Amino acid sequence: MHIVFLNPQGNFDPKDSYLTEHPDFGGQLVYVKELAQALATNGHKVDIVTRKIIDSDWPEFSANQDIYPGTEQNLRILRFPCGGNKFLSKEELWPHLSEFADEILRFYGESLPDFFTAHYADGGYTAALLKQRTRTPFSFTGHSLGAQKLDKLIESGGYWRDLDIRFKFSQRIAAERVSIKYADKIFVSTLQERDEQYRHPLYSGASNSDKSIKFSVSPPGVNRKIFNSVANQLDFSIKPKLDLTFGRSRSQAIIVSSRLDQKKNIIGIVKAFLERRPSLDRVQLVLCIRGIEEPRVDIAKLSKDEQFVLNEILDTIGRDLIGNNVHFLNVTSQLELAATFRYFADRGSIFALTSFYEPFGLAPIEAAAAGLAPVVTKNGGPSEIFSDDFESSSSAIILSLIH
């Protein structure tokens, strides 16, 4: 079977460049990559179709084709131009998706794939355009839906007009409605996602989650080749560096691994840690944020939104605690992240995820697979994966560390 993944935003390359360093390079890309590799390993012909970028700031994505070593016989990364050469964020892509669909059809000609699998609203909208012209069926995986993000931002004091200008919610939600209506199958991670997110009033008429035959609930999994409790050579190579920072006291730590995004609520775990510091005498708070090693220096290279998030964290922590009780780690790959998890798991540490809403819950599963005890948000996917016995993050953290 020939299967094509449609993922206009972000990009893909063998080095996983910029993963978690930009809002368009989040866990969705890991999901697409690993699912595509699994299908290729099982004998299917698979293409990941994304956007071609000719931009000196993003040099990894200028080639028409790329591969992942080990699956090159069955898996290709294909990049098609649309909207000019420069990198465009997902909010800037909407006017160019028709051109993207045209380029895809021009490439395949009469040799159309058997099936498209579309990711995020821009991929879904592209798939709907292609289905209209070729009748090729497609599945839709939303990853996160715009209506929930909009609700959270309005609850936080945002104004519709300002939010729509910035995040293009009108176009995103319209694209999600089209994707939902015309998809042959919709993949969700949890029952909550199906029964609550897709029943949001803004999807009324497009989505009927009572028609469960159209929905497939597929909980997130984890790549056990990377995230496991067995040490490898990388563990031994990073241990001296970590020992220099964290010493040989084997003190416990609270691990956070996230990009700098307000909805990830890193500030929530920082405040919870500071609130209970007297009870967490020798415990360290470790913020694993790709690209951030010296936060007061590295902040200059961040976007304005990321700078706002990091400044709030730094102001809350204060200068005295950074490097003493609170540490930033620049973890540059999934392999290094897994080794870092194992290092701290050996000290009886925990992983904390305090997002306002987390549709997937992939990160805490990866952390748990590497041996860390997870403390996670009750909002979204993690609530169906982990039990919830605590009233607050700070209480959960203390009891998890004790046990």
Model region roles, listed by residue range:
Residues 1-401:
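Catalytic cores of nucleotide-sugar-dependent glycosyltransferases that transfer UDP/GDP/TDP-activated
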